[in-house]
């Protein structure tokens, strides 16, 4: 977890990201779901027994940069996350998280929804 915080402290918006490369299939990912709006794939550094990301194909650097026109797309990410969680057998529950900015732990500046499950989540999360 400390590595992710360190990455977030130096990450900055702008330019291409690893997620853009995954969307364009330039680098491999364990894809769970894909449609014309988004892509869901397993996290390469899982923080729970099940940990996947749902990302929009449209580049939005962070939630604070989202526009009103992105409302439907952002809602779609949550619905896809819910469906993928069900497909992966997360019957007892799961957590959805979006990190915003360096203090929020955002290490990749392309909006992404984390879905974590397969164990009891702790509270508070931070």
From Swiss-Prot:
Belongs to the HINT family. Residues 18-126 form the HIT domain. A motif (Histidine triad motif) lies at residues 110-114. GO terms for biological process: intrinsic apoptotic signaling pathway by p53 class mediator; protein desumoylation; proteolysis; purine ribonucleotide catabolic process; regulation of DNA-templated transcription. It catalyses: adenosine 5'-phosphoramidate + H2O = AMP + NH4(+). The modification Phosphoserine is found at residues 45, 72. InterPro entries: Histidine_triad_CS (IPR019808), Histidine_triad_HIT (IPR001310), HIT-like (IPR011146), HIT-like_sf (IPR036265). Exhibits adenosine 5'-monophosphoramidase activity, hydrolyzing purine nucleotide phosphoramidates with a single phosphate group such as adenosine 5'monophosphoramidate (AMP-NH2) to yield AMP and NH2. Hydrolyzes adenosine 5'monophosphomorpholidate (AMP-morpholidate) and guanosine 5'monophosphomorpholidate (GMP-morpholidate). Hydrolyzes lysyl-AMP (AMP-N-epsilon-(N-alpha-acetyl lysine methyl ester)) generated by lysine tRNA ligase. Hydrolyzes Met-AMP, His-AMP, Asp-AMP, lysyl-GMP (GMP-N-epsilon-(N-alpha-acetyl lysine methyl ester)) and AMP-N-alanine methyl ester. Transmembrane segments: none annotated. Homodimer. Interacts with CDK7. Interacts with RUVBL1 and RUVBL2 and is associated with the LEF1/TCF1-CTNNB1 complex and with a KAT5 histone acetyltransferase complex. Identified in a complex with MITF and CTNNB1. Interacts with CDC34 and RBX1, and is part of a SCF (SKP2-CUL1-F-box protein) E3 ubiquitin-protein ligase complex. Interacts with SUMO1, SUMO2 and RGS17. Interacts with the Ten-1 ICD form of TENM1. Interacts with CALM1; interaction increases in the presence of calcium ions. The active site is at residue 112. PROSITE patterns: HIT_1, HIT_2. Signal peptide: none annotated. It is an enzyme of class 3 (hydrolase). Keywords: Acetylation, Apoptosis, Cytoplasm, Hydrolase, Nucleotide-binding, Nucleus, Phosphoprotein, Protease, Thiol protease, Transcription, Transcription regulation, Ubl conjugation pathway. This is Adenosine 5'-monophosphoramidase HINT1. Its main location: cytoplasm. The gene is HINT1. It comes from the Eukaryota. The modification N-acetylalanine is found at residue 2. PANTHER family: HISTIDINE TRIAD HIT PROTEIN. GO terms for cellular component: cytoplasm; histone deacetylase complex; nucleus. Widely expressed. It is found in: Cytoplasm; Nucleus. The modification N6-acetyllysine is found at residues 21, 30. Its EC number is 3.9.1.-, 3.4.22.-.
């Amino acid at each position: 977890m400390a590595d992710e915080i360190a990455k977030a402290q130096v990450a900055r918006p702008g330019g291409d990201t690893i997620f853009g490369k995954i969307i364009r299939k330039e680098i491999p990912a364990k894809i769970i779901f894909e449609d014309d709006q988004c892509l869901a794939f397993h996290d390469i550094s899982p923080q729970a027994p099940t940990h996947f990301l749902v990302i929009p194909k449209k580049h939005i650097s962070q939630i604070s940069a989202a526009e009103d026109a992105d409302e439907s797309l952002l809602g779609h990410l949550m619905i896809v996350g819910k469906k993928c969680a069900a497909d992966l057998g997360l019957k007892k529950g799961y957590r959805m998280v979006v990190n915003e900015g360096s203090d929020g732990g955002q290490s990749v500046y392309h909006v992404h929804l984390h879905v974590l499950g397969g164990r009891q989540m702790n509270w508070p999360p931070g």
